Amino acid sequence: MSDRMQAYIEQLGRQARAASRVLATASTERKNAALIAAAAALRLRANDLLEANRIDVDGVRKAGKPDAFIDRLMLDGARIEGVASAVEAIATLPDPVGRVLAEIDRPNGLRIERVAVPLGVIGMIYESRPNVGADAGALCLKSGNAVILRGGSESLNSTRIIVECMKEGLREADLPEDAIQMIDTANRDAVKHLLQCTQFVDLVIPRGGKGLVTLVRDQARVPTLLHLDGNCHTYVHAGADLDKAVAIIENAKLRRTGICGATESLVIDESVAADLLPRLIDRMTVCEFRGDPAAVTIDPRVKPADDSDWDTEYLDACLSVKIVDGLEAGINHVAAHSSGHTDAIVTEDADAATCFLAMIDSAVVMHNASTQFSDGGEFGMGAEIGIATGKMHARGPVGLEQLTSFKYLVHGEGQTRP
């Protein structure tokens, strides 16, 4: 089985490599036409996609998966329209390919340009959320990259319809269908072989839980762009407007609990905790609060936290609460437990905000805003392929620009080097 799976992945890679050479020089107009046609196909086949998604959702319900997991998987008419609209939005964005990043005129007459080019072939491994396949396919297409999608086994039926719609867009624009492919099997050996397919795959991007990302990090021979878990913090400083803080925290936790930008840990300055915490518990009635002894003393509705709570991405209606003595203690707690995704401060004190923004070394750091804004669409990228929490190549929401590399074009008039 393993040899057959390796051959299957290599065949997908070979086809993707051939398609990537065509995409690398495809005009912006053709790429945009493919995206618009793909969005139309998603709308046209909405009923097919809903039925496929129903089968997927029924499967995870029978398996006893939690509600937050089911929410990430589930599609409805509004979410399908959102997927189609996101694909269309990418068509309206500037094409990053061919953009001149720098120009150098040398004393010997050589003119050198640094120009943005596609990465080549991208492997995208993700869990649960079928819309990730459409976002990744659209972003890779617009940036001139071929992509091999490996969705979670729980979303196999939904992913299959989405990929068929994306391929329909490619056909309409006379671009190679192999530019967007999926690994159409739940066999886990497929992931291992994709991670080791150095001959054909230039970059692998995992998007999912800590287990998936750790597996990719440990087994990959192909370069990776890691999207770690979102243990996001919101710190309420002594100088916060508490009405503003309540609204921000409720949105940051409960708007959608199952996304990586949801706040998982609340850090409160002790000077405002007795006022703020009971207000939050009264308002956020569906949320479970787990706190340190100081938080439990303020409001007995808070359940005692243990050490693991400070490092847990709940992806559910649960929030850890830490009471701290001042800005330095707040920064130290966030720095010790953040996953490097997104962290926020709520305060009207400009100096405190400046200090927090400088000292917290996360991909996204916010002031007086919900952490759920940590999203490529909200950043004007149209969509995102993930949130990179590392520091190399790309950081934060990964959009079109981050899916390109560059090469140097050197223009001469017969110069020879002495």
From Swiss-Prot:
Enzyme class: oxidoreductase
Listed Gene3D superfamilies: Aldehyde Dehydrogenase, Chain A, domain 1, Aldehyde Dehydrogenase, Chain A, domain 2
One example of a Gene Ontology biological process annotation: L-proline biosynthetic process
UniProt-listed SUPFAM superfamilies: ALDH-like
Pathway it works in: Amino-acid biosynthesis; L-proline biosynthesis; L-glutamate 5-semialdehyde from L-glutamate: step 2/2
Major location category of this protein: cytoplasm
InterPro entries per the UniProt record, alphabetical: Ald_DH/histidinol_DH (IPR016161), Ald_DH_C (IPR016163), Ald_DH_N (IPR016162), Aldehyde_DH_dom (IPR015590), Glu-5-SA_DH (IPR012134), GPR_dom (IPR000965)
Record CDD domains: ALDH_F18-19_ProA-GPR
Subcellular location, record wording: Cytoplasm
Pfam families the record matches: Aldedh
Gene Ontology molecular function terms on file: glutamate-5-semialdehyde dehydrogenase activity; NADP binding
Catalytic reactions of this protein: L-glutamate 5-semialdehyde + phosphate + NADP(+) = L-glutamyl 5-phosphate + NADPH + H(+)
Recorded GO CC terms: cytoplasm
UniProt KW Mitochondrion keyword: no
UniProt-listed Enzyme Commission number(s): 1.2.1.41
Keywords: Amino-acid biosynthesis, Cytoplasm, NADP, Oxidoreductase, Proline biosynthesis
Family stated for the protein in its record: Belongs to the gamma-glutamyl phosphate reductase family.
Function: Catalyzes the NADPH-dependent reduction of L-glutamate 5-phosphate into L-glutamate 5-semialdehyde and phosphate. The product spontaneously undergoes cyclization to form 1-pyrroline-5-carboxylate.
Full protein name: Gamma-glutamyl phosphate reductase
Species name: Maricaulis maris (strain MCS10) (Caulobacter maris)
